[in-house]
């Protein structure tokens, strides 16, 4: 494909097709199921799904079979199946994106809104613009572009789901149903839901951490009691007991997880090599891009150690505490108990079952003065290492990066989680996993002022088109 002609074509398609539809998508307040208790009845997820279906039909992708799946009790899912146009090509390429959204949060600029799209300095602002709305329209536009350029393609399938920000349970359910349709020769999987360290090259994610979320429930009193004459100094304070649990997980001197089962035995050598190359390009930008108050310093001074911390070491954070009175509601009473929600990010290649047993041991080995202390595990997602891409895919993607960004492709790890990738890998262990995206450090996904770099989006459409036509 001639790169100049392709760039010009994609520029036009982005302006007349992608951008207006993506703006309409932002206007739909379709929060992920975890954040919208009424998702089954308010029709917002279905409205977003219908927008995707309408866009796919509008593009008139040749021979595309467009399916909107709506099984009872599950969120909608869009599955598109496009047969190969190459003769005797029985390979399948699977592309993925999600169209549910995080809550809006606070702190948006006065002239910006999560559901009223704004274009400013070649960035599109609004919830879902970067995570992950652009992916759906980019993927479909790339496929149509290939057809318009008369490129012969392998079979292409698309899965667009609407529960990624909550759980992968719905996606796994549908994926298992689709396995017989997908067949046994899926050679590449492209989840377009990852990030980039800059907008000057194609970034390829080769590792993601897992996540383990759990609740620590502490019960001491059958009712609230006056903390002065009744309970103070007699009954152990709830946060003190919660801290005992936390201290069993975290080394309080340095904040590191001390449960050995949570650590990977050895970081792959290829990761060390790629980190060195990445740091040569990015340097300390990772730190500079964090919204720190003056005087706040990172846990370590060495950038490489910080990136290893973020990608290949476990962390534990407190997400919330129930039954802890707000300051404005303060009284002289001790609550009957508390529930602390904790979340661990876990490196790839660790054993979930051993970690859960180790966490249970933290409870059984500690003394809590007879208080009822229990663990409730409510969510787990596997980490994944994707270090075995074929040379053919690497070469195509690297050439595409040079053509459309002007620089070589770079591999890097991610500190976040896309648990479904590990599940896909278990079903198709020999497939190339091409995990990429254009969510940069200024995209603010999950936070206020989420935005999409529109120039990077155009380049990503070009790269997808190029890869699909060359693979």
Which residues does each PLM region occupy?
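N-terminal helical capping/dimerization or prosegment-like subdomains
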Residues: 2-105, 337, 341
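A short core secondary-structure module
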Residues: 229-255
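An extended, acidic, His-containing surface patch that forms the Zn2+-binding/catalytic region
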Residues: 49, 88, 198-199, 258-337, ...
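Acidic/histidine-rich catalytic neighborhood of metal-dependent amide-processing enzymes
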Residues: 123-124, 128-207
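Active-site metal-coordination/substrate-binding segment of hydrolases
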Residues: 89-160, 455, 459
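A generic structural motif
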Residues: 130, 222-224, 231, 344-352
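A common structural junction motif
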Residues: 99-100, 249-254, 360-370
């Amino acid at each position: 494909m001639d790169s100049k002609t392709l760039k010009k074509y994609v520029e036009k398609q982005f302006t007349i097709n992608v951008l207006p539809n993506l703006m309409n998508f932002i206007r739909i307040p379709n929060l992920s199921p975890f954040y919208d208790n009424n998702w089954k009845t308010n029709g917002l997820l279905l409205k977003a799904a219908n927008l995707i279906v309408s866009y796919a039909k509008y593009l008139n992708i040749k021979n595309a079979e467009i399916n909107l799946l709506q099984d009872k009790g599950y969120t909608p899912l869009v599955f598109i199946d496009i047969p190969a146009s190459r003769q005797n090509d029985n390979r399948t390429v699977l592309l993925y994106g999600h169209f549910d959204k995080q809550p809006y949060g606070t702190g948006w600029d006065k002239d910006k809104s999560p559901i009223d799209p704004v274009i400013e300095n070649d960035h599109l602002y609004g919830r879902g613009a970067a995570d992950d709305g652009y992916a759906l329209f980019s993927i479909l536009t790339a496929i149509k572009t290939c057809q318009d350029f008369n490129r012969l393609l392998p079979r292409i399938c698309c899965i667009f789901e609407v529960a990624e920000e909550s759980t992968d349970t719905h996606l796994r359910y549908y994926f298992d149903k689709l396995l017989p349709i997908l067949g046994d020769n899926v050679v590449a999987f492209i989840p377009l839901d990852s990030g980039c360290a800059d907008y000057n090259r194609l970034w390829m994610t080769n590792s993601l951490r897992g996540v383990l979320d759990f609740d620590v429930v502490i019960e001491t009193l059958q009712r609230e009691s006056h903390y002065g004459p009744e309970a103070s100094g007699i009954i152990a304070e709830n946060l003190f007991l919660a801290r005992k649990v936390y201290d069993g997980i975290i080394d309080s001197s340095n904040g590191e997880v001390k449960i050995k089962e949570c650590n990977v035995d050895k970081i792959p050598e290829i990761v060390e090599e790629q980190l060195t190359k990445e740091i040569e390009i990015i340097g300390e930008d990772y730190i500079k891009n964090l919204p720190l108050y003056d005087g706040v310093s990172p846990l370590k001074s060495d950038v490489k150690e910080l990136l290893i911390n973020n990608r290949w070491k476990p962390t534990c954070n407190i997400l919330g505490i129930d039954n802890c009175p707000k300051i404005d509601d303060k009284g002289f009473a001790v609550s009957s108990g508390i529930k602390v929600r904790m979340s661990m990010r876990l490196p790839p290649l660790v054993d979930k079952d051993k970690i859960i047993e180790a966490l249970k041991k933290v409870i059984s080995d500690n003394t809590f003065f007879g208080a009822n202390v229990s663990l409730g595990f409510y969510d787990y997602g596997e980490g994944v290492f994707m270090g075995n891409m074929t040379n053919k895919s690497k070469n195509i993607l690297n050439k595409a990066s040079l053509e459309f960004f002007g620089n070589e492709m770079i591999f890097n790890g991610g500190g976040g989680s896309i648990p479904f990738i590990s599940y896909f890998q278990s079903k198709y262990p020999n497939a190339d996993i091409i995990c990429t995206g254009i969510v940069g450090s200024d995209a603010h996904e999950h936070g206020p002022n989420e935005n999409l770099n529109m120039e990077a989006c155009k380049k990503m459409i070009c790269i997808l088109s190029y890869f699909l036509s060359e693979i």
